Amino acid sequence: MVDFPSRFDVIVIGGGHAGTEAALASARMGVKTLLLTHNVETLGHMSCNPAIGGIGKSHLVKEIDALGGAMALATDKSGIQFRVLNNRKGPAVRATRAQADRAIYKAVVREILENQPNLWIFQQSCDDLIVEQDQVKGVVTQMGLRFFAESVVLTTGTFLGGLIHIGLQNHSGGRAGDPPSIALAHRMRELPLRVGRLKTGTPPRIDGRSVDFSVMTEQPGDTPIPVMSFMGNAEMHPRQVSCWITHTNARTHEIIASNLDRSPMYSGVIEGVGPRYCPSIEDKIHRFADKESHQVFIEPEGLNTHELYPNGISTSLPFDVQLELVRSIRGMENAHIVRPGYAIEYDYFDPRDLKYSLETKVIGGLFFAGQINGTTGYEEAGAQGLLAGTNAALRAQGRDSWCPRRDEAYIGVLVDDLITLGTQEPYRMFTSRAEYRLILREDNADLRLTEKGRELGLIDDQRWAAFCAKRDGIEREEQRLKSTWVRPNTEQGQAIVDKFGTPLSHEYSLLNLLARPEIDYAGLIEATGGEAIDPQVAEQVEIRTKYAGYIDRQQDEIARLRASEDTRLPVDIDYTTISGLSKEIQGKLSQTRPQTLGQASRIPGVTPAAISLLLIHLKKRGAGRELEQSA
């Protein structure tokens, strides 16, 4: 064993989406951070589909961005197609999605990492953790080099005990072309943590020169081109390209159905549970047997490659079956497969063994982020990485941990779901998981989180100045609209009637008019001769005005719930002594050990009546302690 000559405050294991955000967050906060990766060339690598964002996911990306993270800016600099999903629905569920050039995205992330002060990168696999008296002290690499730190963040992705399946054949691997973490997986299984197996998969990659796009439906990006980062702009984007849509058919389904006995999932070879919302094509055919076809989105992997990602046909069937099913799809009759699809099984740890900070309950200073916690997706991983890296740095600084509440961020929803409910399948974020989604929009992530990020030390001066200018601009414009009045039978009044067909019965402020559903901000400014302002400011003014009543109602609901939500439950509370609680509920509470009353209320099977009994118990306990102190 050899000790590295320098000591670190935080060590991050893994250079994927969770690891990069964790390392960057920790370093931005001013603590000495080491990023340990098995291969420097794969930092920020997109292991699965070449896309960032989507329903629920873009909210996480914008929150990462609002806290100074890299994912959104890397997407703006590498995005080759941008679209806003649910554009005809309300702002709460609108979501930005971008196709990214894999090579550019990875290069941008690496550049950000290499230029981040307080961050050191070292290429070596981690084989062991140094743990003394239930506290992590450092790590040991493959060559026996020891690094010491106050906190360690594990972001191992699919590498822990990774097993790759193609047909009935399998081999060890972290992903295609990369070795797994076997020694570390064995070490982790020695810790007093609940462990399970999950699986995910990827489709075969296709050579675009062998595809007939003329029989497919073109899917261009949006115009004007959306932007992902609050600090981004459309000028950052590379050349934009289209995606294409085709479909499976009866012949495709017949090929798959007749070969299910050769599928590792349906022959019992794979034990891990796959993602419900990103099923393999075998799963789709089996679960939705009544459907005659399934969409396949043909996504370009980049501007300087012919490789295509056929989103929708993830598979682990044998190669000969993969080739046959691909060539049964319209437009891909002569397709050449560049890389076969595969499934991968890996270890994950029950997130109910974590605190809100993502620190493990049993090993002090050991944090988990990403797929190790049972999630799926780049965005979910990046969000956890940022939070874990932040809390690892806070711990090194001797400061209190932080996690946003469910009413403050989708990051808060994600973490609360994981540590309260756990997961038996890969967890994916959706807007439907958030009860306060009208407040947790992707467009206002900076207004919700950037001020807190500045307080934590995550936000640099440039981003802070831009945020303050936007926040002040919103306040100024709302005040201007509130104090500007329009009367009937005036030039401005008539302009509004002509523009919107809305007669004015009496004097209105521009803010009152903007609240009307038929009046939009751009048209109102055009009719009344106002000056053009920052589009981000204009968007916020319009949304806040039109949804003011609903937003106020949701804020009132949050205020009512927050009192009990934040009530702390003592660490040493013995649920078996609380009269009135059923044995089942006592067991659930004893196993989960919720930190707050709000968290306890979200445990499946814990009734409102049980929460009332807990509240009564806490009041009695508090009163009893006051009597003891007075005596």
Swiss-Prot record:
Q: What is this protein called?
A: tRNA uridine 5-carboxymethylaminomethyl modification enzyme MnmG
Give the SMART domains listed for this entry: GIDA_assoc_3
One matching Pfam family is SAM_GIDA_C
> Which annotated residues bind NAD(+)?
274-288
What keywords does the record list, in alphabetical order? Answer: Cytoplasm, FAD, Flavoprotein, NAD, tRNA processing
- Source organism's superkingdom? Bacteria
Role, per record: NAD-binding protein involved in the addition of a carboxymethylaminomethyl (cmnm) group at the wobble position (U34) of certain tRNAs, forming tRNA-cmnm(5)s(2)U34.
Q: Name one GO biological process term.
A: tRNA wobble uridine modification
Q: Where do the annotations place FAD binding?
A: 14-19
Q: Which gene encodes it?
A: mnmG
Localisation: Cytoplasm
* Assembly information from the UniProt record: Homodimer. Heterotetramer of two MnmE and two MnmG subunits.
Q: Which InterPro entries match?
A: FAD/NAD-bd_sf, GIDA_C_N, MnmG, MnmG-rel, MnmG-rel_CS, MnmG_C, MnmG_C_subdom, MnmG_C_subdom_sf
Q: Which organism is it from?
A: Pseudomonas putida (strain ATCC 47054 / DSM 6125 / CFBP 8728 / NCIMB 11950 / KT2440)
Which HAMAP family does UniProt cross-reference here?
MnmG_GidA
